Amino acid sequence: MLGLPPFAYASPKTVEEASEILVSSQHAVLVSGGTDLYPNIKRRQVEPRLLVSLSGIAALRGIRGDGDRGLTIGALSTLEEVATSPLVTGRYPVLAEATMSVGSPQIRNGATLGGNLCQDTRCSYYDMPLGWRKGVGYCLKRGGDVCRIAPGSDRCWAVSSSDIAPVAMALNASVSLVSTRGERLMGVKSLYRNDGVSHLSMARDEILTELKIPPSGGLKAKYLKLRQRGTIDFPLLGVAVAVRLDEQGVCTLARVVLGAVGSSPVEAEASEEILTGGKLTDEKVKQASTEASRLARPMDNTGLTLQYRKAMVQVYVARALKALAA
């Protein structure tokens, strides 16, 4: 059985205090729910000397707002709190769908919104115990100089596996980042980098404090998730689609975002252009879903074959669009 190594533990009471600790210690790592981090520590993917817990910072909890003014969700809100909040289920049901698809009831009651947005990228090679990785040879993401999945590449192709990120992008959400230098607002799309090693566009001492979702404005959205089992599993493909239809059924706005097919969520802008300005006819749906599948570039570093996952992009985008057109 894999165990945790020794480490120091800090429990600051404010975001500013937590950020100051990150500045003072280069070996400090943030933890909130820990449902992703602790297994990674057990596998020695991360070896922190100091864990900085955010669980004692009350200001990071809570959900406030509505569909008319927009919604602000504290980063320490658990996924169960998000999935069952009337503020979410009433005006942003797609966010409830995505959060309810994560893990199990036990995991959702511990895992946090901020943790899901910031969780590490995944790879079938990297996500192995230390002894296995040491025997085969380390990879570019941890301790080595080659990507074992794509040896000819000079970058890491570990996969973004957040269920919340594609939905947040489809809703045009933003996040608040706080550090000792102050606070800044960043669109969720800009939060992610297409790099399996350094996948977040955050300074080391920045802390994600809130997710801000703009007024719904009649936006309809759907999230579909491909996985090997009906529960627990990380996405092998996540599809978030949002559309705004006028009274005649004409699509005036479309967003199509693919998760788990790259090191960051992928926005299918060509599909969005196809959908905008017309009704969601079968032909439009086929064109948009085909274009999304063409754009997807999954690697053979997670469950199921990359060919199957790529083919299912078209199927899932089409399903989501048809559900929204109904």
Give, region by region, the residue ranges found by the protein language model.
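C-terminal structural segment of proteins
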Residues: 1-326
